């Protein structure tokens, strides 16, 4: 079973590896600038989490919690660990917290999306 640790500031010991995965996994136009990252981390409805499998970092999630539903803004699995079911496990655990959850997926319609 995956475990997760909440990251509440850029000073967190896990922030650097999360930020590196974030930069690799999402196109530049979907990424927050540094100040916007700090603001999101301080928002009470936002949760940035580092996910681990037996101590090995496997991915990240950035979720918002609202009255009655959750919204997954970012979800990424380390590129060296993809196709091993981690995304499915991570998503399943998030859904136990908020069964009604929105996961936005951008269609692969541009060269940058591919």
Which residue stretches match the model-derived regions?
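Short amphipathic alpha-helix that is part of the acyltransferase structural core
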Residues: 1-36
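Recognition helices and adjacent regulatory flanks at domain boundaries
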Residues: 29-39, 51, 86
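A short helix-loop-beta-strand connector motif used in the catalytic cores of GNAT acetyltransferases and
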Residues: 39-50, 71
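Conserved beta-strand in the GNAT
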Residues: 50, 55-76
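A short, internal acetyl-CoA/4′-phosphopantetheine-binding micro-motif in the GNAT/acyltransferase core
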Residues: 75-82, 107
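Conserved acetyl-CoA pyrophosphate-binding loop and the N-cap/start of the following alpha-helix
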Residues: 81-93
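Conserved GNAT acetyl-CoA-binding A-motif
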Residues: 97-113
